[in-house]
Amino acid sequence: MMQEKLQKLFKEINLEEELFSYFNNATLDKVVVYDNNKQIDFILNTESVLPIEVYNNTLYKLISYFNAIENIRLIIKPSNIDNGLLSSYYFDI
C-alpha cells in the first residue's frame, strides 16, 4: 500500500491512478525546498526502479503543478535494482 501523504500528493498533481500501482509500498522520504523557491526535490523510497515512462510522467505532473518553481527534481531511491529497467533510462535519452 502506498503511503498516505504520497497518495495525497499524487492526487493533488492529478497523476493517473493506473500509475499508483508502481508506487506500492513507496514512501515520500522528504521534500527539500531550496532558497528563493527556485528548486524543490521530491525524494521517494520505492521497492524497485520505476519504468522510465512512469518516472517521466510523474516528473511532468510535478513540474506542471509546481510551475512557479524553476527546477523540480524527482529522486527515486529503490531498495531493489533492476539493471534492465535502469538501461531503459539511458536508451530513452
List where the protein language model places each region:
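Intrinsically disordered, low-complexity basic tails and flexible linkers associated
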Residues: 1-93
